[in-house]
Amino acid sequence: MRVITRFAPSPTGSLHLGGARTALFNWLFARRHGGQFLLRMEDTDQERSSETVAQSIIEDMAWLGLHHDQDVVIQSARRERHTQVAEELLARGKAYYCYCSEDDIAAEKLRHENEGKHYRHHCPSRDANHAQSGTAGVLRLKSPENREIKFTDGVYGEISVSSEQIDDMVILRSNGHPTYLLAVVVDDHDMCITHIIRGSDHITNTIKQMLLAEAMGWDNPQFCHIPLIHDEGGAKLSKRNRAPGVHEYRELGFLPEAVCNYLLRMGWSHKDEEIITMQSATQLFSIEKIGTSHSCLDSKKLLFLNHHYMNQKTELEILGLLLPFLEQELGHTVAETKLARLSLGVKKLMERAKTLADLARDSVFYVQNIPISVDDDAKQVILKSSELLAKLVGAMSQIEPKTWTKDFLSSYIKEWTKSNDVVISDVYHLLRAAIAGRLSTPSISEVMEILGQEECISRLRFFLNS
């Protein structure tokens, strides 16, 4: 049997971390077994679904490297097929039309809840084998009576639910539109899905979907439910209490390798390894290694992973990834000559930067035109050091261009401070402030060598004359 998995998001909102992890686990399982990973857009909620959102989900998945096989299946385009199955269930006596009003059902349900009882809707039309003419009703599947419904979950083991807990579910609305539950079962069957990996909040749906497949005489896929992701404090994520989506992590400057590694370790493990590449994961991934406890967001771990993967890149690779963030920081494109300058200093800056956005902010001084941006601390240093600034302009101008190297600059500055009775830390602070616009940089002598004598003196003069 060839393994076929699927990811089936609803295009009503961006790809969040829980959805991305579900997609990742399905993708890895398919790749691990030489199978296929399919993508289906579950857009039965036509009012809230958006083609733009669907496209953004596809783009975010591609950014993560989770490329799907075959064409994307659009659920709403298969409405005729879903309706056909519903009519077949009606013809087989497995479904019936219900004409009870929603208000009456809600009132009856509330009465049972107030009495501490479970409400299971019993429609007077349950045993009728035809629709009432001129009346709009919903089509319901007949749930079994007095039976335990069981299945072996790939993560949680055996799960059992009494049929008395399962309502006769609606499969066609009164307007004739198929419901989500019906569409999912039909699509999974027609797409030959063998394994479904999804969040544990779907277990109730799974029981109902199993009954639908059973009524049609279809085999059920292997279900694997994974624990949900909680926030850093251990609370469940919700619409109000949500984590950034995949697109937001992209904009914050995280690498797809880091996000995938992070998602993988939220629920799945291999020994005590934290760094697991996708290449390794496709060889190691198995359902058996998924835990049953919920996972919590850990921003420090994500930053650690991102820092690691950033430092696996070459200077050329990093520059390509960094360029959009630099241009956003600057508000304009970066000249090739300035990128070449940055390439000489970017590795040092990567030692501390955790994201591409961090790296862009830390490295922007290499590619800025005069006047460069200056943070508040650097401004204060410049404002109170005008006399020292004038002396430094003169001192830097006396250096022979051919000797403008980090080693010479380092020794020259030390000697100059001694002979001029100046505190060396004051000199370094001022050079950083006026040349880099901040007080924290790699070795200022190294920065000055990369920028060059002319650029450094021009920056010093600008602040002297301001």
Curated annotation (Swiss-Prot):
It is found in: Cytoplasm. GO terms for biological process: glutamyl-tRNA aminoacylation. Its main location: cytoplasm. GO terms for cellular component: cytosol. Its EC number is 6.1.1.17. A motif ('KMSKS' region) lies at residues 236-240. It comes from the Bacteria. Pfam families: Anticodon_2, tRNA-synt_1c. A motif ('HIGH' region) lies at residues 9-19. Coiled coil: none annotated. The keyword Aminoacyl-tRNA synthetase applies. InterPro entries: aa-tRNA-synth_I_cd-bd, aa-tRNA-synth_I_codon-bd_sub2, aa-tRNA-synth_I_CS, aa_tRNA-synth_I_cd-bd_sf, Glu-tRNA-ligase_bac/mito, Glu/Gln-tRNA-synth, Glu/Gln-tRNA-synth_Ib_cat-dom, GluQ/Sye. Keywords: Aminoacyl-tRNA synthetase, ATP-binding, Cytoplasm, Ligase, Nucleotide-binding, Protein biosynthesis. ATP binds at K239. Gene3D superfamilies: 1.10.10.350, HUPs. It catalyses: tRNA(Glu) + L-glutamate + ATP = L-glutamyl-tRNA(Glu) + AMP + diphosphate. One of its GO terms (molecular function) is tRNA binding. Catalyzes the attachment of glutamate to tRNA(Glu) in a two-step reaction: glutamate is first activated by ATP to form Glu-AMP and then transferred to the acceptor end of tRNA(Glu). Belongs to the class-I aminoacyl-tRNA synthetase family. Glutamate--tRNA ligase type 1 subfamily. Monomer. This is Glutamate--tRNA ligase 2. It comes from Anaplasma marginale (strain St. Maries).
